[in-house]
C-alpha cells in the first residue's frame, strides 16, 4: 500500500529550480502582502465599509488561503532531494484546495450579483445588499466550498494505491492522484468532471450572462455615470477570466496536456492570487485613495512613536 506520494515538480534542472525558488518566493511574498493590504485597507477605512468591499476583502482572504495550500510546499521542495507528501497530507491538500477553490467560485458569483444589483437596480441596492445579506452570502460561500471539498475527498478516500506513487505536479489534486489508483477509474473520472467541471463551467457561464446584462445596461447610461461602473466591472471580469480560465481546462477539458496542466496549475494557484490585488487596486480610485490614507496614517504614527 502507498503511504506517500512523490511530486515530480516543475523541473529537474538544479539551475532552473534555484531560479524558480527565488521567483516563487517573491511571488508568494507579493500574494501575502497584496491580499493582506486589501483586507487591512477595507477594515481600517470607513468609506470602504460597503457590500462590494466586504466581498473583496473576503475574496482576498480566500486567494491568500488558496495559494498557501500549495505555494509554501512548492517553494521548500525546490531544494528537497525527494519531494514527498504523506497520503494523509495529500488528502488534506485536496480538501483545502477544493474548499477554497469552491468558495472562490461562489464569492465571484456573489460579487457579480452585487454589481448587477448596484448597476441594474440601484434604488433597491441598500435593501437587497444589507448587512444580514452579506453575512448570509459568506455563510453560503463557505458552506458550498465545504460541501464541494467533502465530495472531492469522498472520491479519493476509498481508492486503493498499491503501485506507482509519482504525481506529475507540485501538489495533490484529484485528477492527477486518481490516475495512480490500482482500480479502473474511468467512471470516477467522469464523476470528477461532472462535479468540478460542471460546477466550474456553469458558474462561468452564469457570470458571463450576468456581466453581459450589466454591460447592456451601462450602454444606455450617460458616459459620465457609466465610466466608474465600467471601470469596476472591467476589474471583476478580468479576475473572473483569470480564475475560471485555468479551472475550465484543468477540471472540464477531457484531453489534458501535462505541460499545459502544470502551467495552468501555477497560474491558478500562484499567478491569479498575485494579480487580483493589483487589478482591484489599479482599477479602483477608492482603493488607491484609501491605501494612500493608510500610508499617511502609518507614517504619522511612526513619527509620533
Swiss-Prot record:
**Topological category with respect to the lipid bilayer:** Multi-pass membrane protein
Q: List the disulfide bonds.
A: 90-182
What SUPFAM superfamilies has UniProt attached to this entry? Family A G protein-coupled receptor-like
Query: Which InterPro entries does UniProt cross-reference here?
Result: GPCR_Rhodpsn, GPCR_Rhodpsn_7TM, Olfact_rcpt, Olfactory_Receptors
PROSITE patterns per record: G_PROTEIN_RECEP_F1_1 (PS00237), G_PROTEIN_RECEP_F1_2 (PS50262)
A single GO CC term for this protein reads: plasma membrane
| Transmembrane annotation, as ranges | 19-42, 51-72, 94-113, 133-151, 189-212, 229-251, 263-282
Q: Which residues lie on this side of the membrane: Cytoplasmic?
A: 43-50, 114-132, 213-228, 283-305
Q: Describe the family membership recorded for this protein in Swiss-Prot or TrEMBL.
A: Belongs to the G-protein coupled receptor 1 family.
This chain belongs to the protein called Olfactory receptor 4F5
Organismal lineage: Eukaryota, Metazoa, Chordata, Craniata, Vertebrata
The gene it comes from is OR4F5
Amino acid at each position: 500500500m502507498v503511504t506517500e506520494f512523490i511530486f515530480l515538480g516543475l523541473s529537474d534542472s538544479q539551475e532552473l529550480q534555484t531560479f524558480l525558488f527565488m521567483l516563487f518566493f517573491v511571488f508568494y511574498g507579493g500574494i501575502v502582502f497584496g491580499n493582506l493590504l486589501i483586507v487591512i485597507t477595507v477594515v481600517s477605512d470607513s468609506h470602504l465599509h460597503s457590500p462590494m468591499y466586504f466581498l473583496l476583502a473576503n475574496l482576498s482572504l480566500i486567494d491568500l488561503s488558496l495559494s498557501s495550500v500549495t505555494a509554501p510546499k512548492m517553494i521548500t521542495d525546490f531544494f528537497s532531494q525527494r519531494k514527498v507528501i504523506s497520503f494523509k497530507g495529500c488528502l488534506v491538500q485536496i480538501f483545502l484546495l477544493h474548499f477554497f477553490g469552491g468558495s472562490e467560485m461562489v464569492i465571484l458569483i456573489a460579487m457579480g450579483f452585487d454589481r448587477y444589483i448596484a448597476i441594474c437596480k440601484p434604488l433597491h441596492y441598500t435593501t437587497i445588499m444589507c448587512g444580514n445579506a452579506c453575512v448570509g452570502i459568506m455563510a453560503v460561500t463557505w458552506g458550498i466550498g465545504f460541501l464541494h471539498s467533502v465530495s472531492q475527498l469522498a472520491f479519493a478516500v476509498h481508492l486503493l494505491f498499491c503501485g506507482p506513487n509519482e504525481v506529475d505536479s507540485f501538489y495533490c489534486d484529484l485528477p492527477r492522484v486518481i490516475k495512480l489508483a490500482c482500480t479502473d477509474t474511468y467512471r470516477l473520472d467522469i464523476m470528477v468532471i461532472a462535479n468540478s467541471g460542471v460546477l466550474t463551467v456553469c458558474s462561468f457561464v452564469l457570470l458571463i450572462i450576468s456581466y453581459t446584462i450589466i454591460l447592456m445596461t451601462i450602454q444606455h447610461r450617460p458616459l459620465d455615470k457609466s465610466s466608474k461602473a465600467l471601470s469596476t466591472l472591467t476589474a471583476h471580469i478580468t479576475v473572473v477570466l483569470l480564475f475560471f480560465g485555468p479551472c475550465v481546462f484543468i477540471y472540464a477539458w477531457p484531453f489534458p496536456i501535462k505541460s499545459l496542466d502544470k502551467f495552468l496549475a501555477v497560474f491558478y494557484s500562484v499567478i491569479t492570487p498575485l494579480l487580483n490585488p493589483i487589478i482591484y487596486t489599479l482599477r479602483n480610485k477608492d482603493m488607491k485613495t484609501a491605501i494612500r490614507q493608510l500610508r499617511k496614517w502609518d507614517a504619522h504614527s511612526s513619527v509620533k512613536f
